[in-house]
From Swiss-Prot:
One of its GO terms (cellular component) is proton-transporting ATP synthase complex. This is V-type ATP synthase alpha chain. Keywords: ATP synthesis, ATP-binding, Hydrogen ion transport, Ion transport, Nucleotide-binding, Translocase, Transport. Pfam families: ATP-synt_ab (PF00006), ATP-synt_ab_N (PF02874), ATP-synt_ab_Xtn (PF16886), ATP-synt_VA_C (PF22919). InterPro entries: ATP-synt_VA_C (IPR055190), ATP-synth_a_Xtn (IPR031686), ATP_synth_asu-like_sf (IPR023366), ATPase_a/bsu_AS (IPR020003), ATPase_F1/V1/A1_a/bsu_N (IPR004100), ATPase_F1/V1/A1_a/bsu_N_sf (IPR036121), ATPase_F1/V1/A1_a/bsu_nucl-bd (IPR000194), ATPase_F1/V1_b/a_C (IPR024034). The keyword Transport applies. Produces ATP from ADP in the presence of a proton gradient across the membrane. The V-type alpha chain is a catalytic subunit.
Length: 592
């Protein structure tokens, strides 16, 4: 497309204003200056275009050429996404390193997907079959655990004229589809504009929980497959570790991890850990199901906005294949700060704390692309895209605009508490402030698939923790001696729930992940201890004797029982019953 070349009129950090751009459109990608820096038009006024440049603008000068490509910012979708690491505008970092060295050179142009690598394509359709947008015509075994489904692109339908098995690159024709007189070549790669959500058949009601292996989340504040959640918390409260834990252990088939404006070391941790950690379901390295988007704090600010959209478009693509996808965005506050900076340079009217007035609608555009859907196509595939965004409110102030805009949209809130973090209680999710609006939808699934009394146990445990908070107020005022033995027992059981159940060590090889079966048995064990000790108290046994029982140590160590030895927890139930029976039979006099 030969479009007229514009000229740079003004440069203000990542914002460039160009004139002579009357042939361009809003959101077109442009190449700025002699080095052809990548930018995107975000505002048009007559022949002037305001461009946010995704690379460092130092060295640009008024009068430099600006060439529009005539296309919106798009991502390439096809085999080669899994195990790859991209920057915010989907440039593969490995390819950039091979071409330009360890540092990203300005204006470097590389294809998002490798044009030389060949993939083995196995057709699932044959000549003469009728296909429509979204139909799977063949598969590519991308990694040992991900089967990449090659779908008919949106807008194409007809009858297959040719299709063949073999080794192809992502730009080789693998099939031809004829519709009336028009013949379309199908390749293994699609392009899709990042700011436009990928189409689907219809949205479905999410009812199945996304199992994370984190007890406080799965038991008290679960998120569904296709749900939305946010993790706000002050600095040092463990947001990134929570995000890493979810990326490691969530039972999603694909994980998209976006490091948006956070420290580079955190992405390095992911790169070092994921190839070595094994997926509990498949036994394969976690990296074989992961796409990484690294847009660290020292990369250009404008690209932070693009990285969020790049990541969710890749997530939607795998969702359309029928996969359950989990997307982690760490942190959406940095993305909002990028919006604020661009809004300030555009001289727009500021909203709360300088953020643009459209912050809420932009956040909604992002989170509303999550969901469980029936994909396009005749097969009726169901896919889910779960979005979990970290929010970094300055000073932990949850009333600031980004947190409030996010809370209006998402249905799960995992509030991280600096006080819990200072007490070394991790994950530092405050059980009194956090909530999940999916509980009613998930409870029937849990009762059916885990245990019939799961919901009842969860409700009892939550009420104990809330009663503990009330009793602690009394203890602070008049001291623990003013409490009855039954209330003191409640405090001890709530402490056991906090320390033996909710606390979880992300860096312990066993405690880092707990299956639902193990979570159920651990929770039931703590509440069984409460029931049995209440029975003993009513029979006249002294509270001190009950609290000194050796079996309490075994309850505390239940979290370190491996998944293969879960039956060992059952033995603690029997031992506890026997000890309590013996105490009662001796009238409460026993050296336990």
């Amino acid at each position: 497309m030969n479009l007229k070349t514009g000229r740079v009129l003004k440069i203000s950090g990542p914002l460039v204003v160009a004139e002579g751009m009357e042939e361009a459109n809003i959101y077109d990608v442009v190449k700025v200056g002699e080095k052809r820096l990548i930018g995107e038009i975000i505002e048009m006024r007559e022949d002037r275009a305001s461009i946010q440049v995704y690379e460092e603008t130092a060295g640009l000068a008024p009068g430099d050429p600006v060439i529009t490509t005539g296309e919106p910012l798009s991502v390439e979708l096809g085999p080669g996404l899994i195990e790859a690491m991209f920057d915010g505008i989907q440039r593969p970092l490995n390819a950039i390193k091979a071409k330009a060295g360890d540092f990203i050179t300005r204006g470097v142009e590389v294809h998002s997907l490798d044009r030389d690598r060949k993939w083995h394509f196995t057709p699932l359709k044959k000549v003469g079959d009728t296909v429509e947008a979204g139909d799977v015509i063949g598969i590519v075994q991308e990694t040992s655990i991900v089967e990449h489904k090659i779908m008919v692109p949106y807008g194409i339908k007809g009858t297959i004229e040719t299709i063949e098995e073999g080794d192809f690159t992502v730009v080789d024709t693998v099939a031809k589809v004829k519709d009336k007189d028009k013949v379309s070549d199908l390749i293994m790669m699609q392009k899709w504009p990042v700011r436009r959500g990928r189409p689907y058949g219809r949205k479905l009601n999410p009812v199945e929980p996304m199992i994370t292996g984190q007890r406080v989340i799965d038991t008290f504040f679960p998120v569904t497959k296709g749900g939305t959640a946010c993790v706000p918390g002050p600095f040092g409260s463990g947001k990134t570790v929570v995000q890493h834990q979810l990326a490691k252990w969530a039972d999603a088939q694909i994980v998209v991890y976006i490091g948006c404006g956070e420290r580079g070391n955190e992405m390095t941790d992911v790169l070092n850990e994921f190839p070595e950690l094994k997926d509990p379901k498949t036994g394969e390295p976690l990296m074989k199901r992961t796409v990484l988007i690294a847009n660290t704090s020292n990369m250009p600010v404008a690209a932070r906005e693009a990285s969020i959209y790049t990541g969710i478009t890749i997530g939607e693509y795998f969702r359309d294949m029928g996969y359950s996808v989990a997307l982690m965005a760490d942190s959406t506050s940095r993305w909002a700060e990028a919006l604020r900076e661009m809004s300030g340079r555009l001289e727009e009217m500021p909203g709360d704390e300088g953020y643009p007035a459209y912050l809420g609608s932009r956040a909604a555009d992002f989170y509303e692309r999550a969901g469980k859907v029936l994909s396009l196509g005749s097969e009726g595939r169901e896919g889910a895209l779960t979005v979990i965004g970290a929010v970094s409110p300055p000073g932990g102030d949850l009333s600031e605009p980004v947190t409030q805009a996010t809370l209006r949209i998402v249905k799960v809130f995992w509030g991280l508490d600096s006080q819990l973090a200072y007490r070394r209680h991790f994950p530092a999710i405050n059980w009194l402030n956090s909530y999940s609006l999916y509980l009613e939808k998930i409870s029937p699934w849990m009762d059916e698939n885990v245990a019939s009394d799961w919901t009842a146990l969860r409700t009892r445990a939550m009420s104990l923790l809330q009663e503990e908070a009330n009793l602690e107020e009394i203890v602070r005022l008049v001291g623990i001696d003013a409490l009855s033995e039954k209330d003191r027992l409640k405090l001890e059981v709530a402490k056991s729930l906090r320390e033996d159940y909710l606390q979880q060590n992300a860096f312990h090889e066993v405690d880092t992940y707990a299956s639902l079966e193990k979570q159920y048995k651990m929770l039931k064990l703590v509440l069984f201890f409460y029931d049995e000790t209440q029975r003993a108290l009513n029979a006249g046994v002294y509270l001190k004797e009950l609290l000194d029982l050796e079996v309490r140590d075994k309850i505390a160590r239940a979290k370190y029982v491996s998944e293969e030895s879960i039956e060992n927890i059952d033995a603690i139930f029997n031992e506890l019953s026997e000890v309590i029976d013996e105490l009662i039979s001796k009238g409460g006099i026993m050296n336990a």
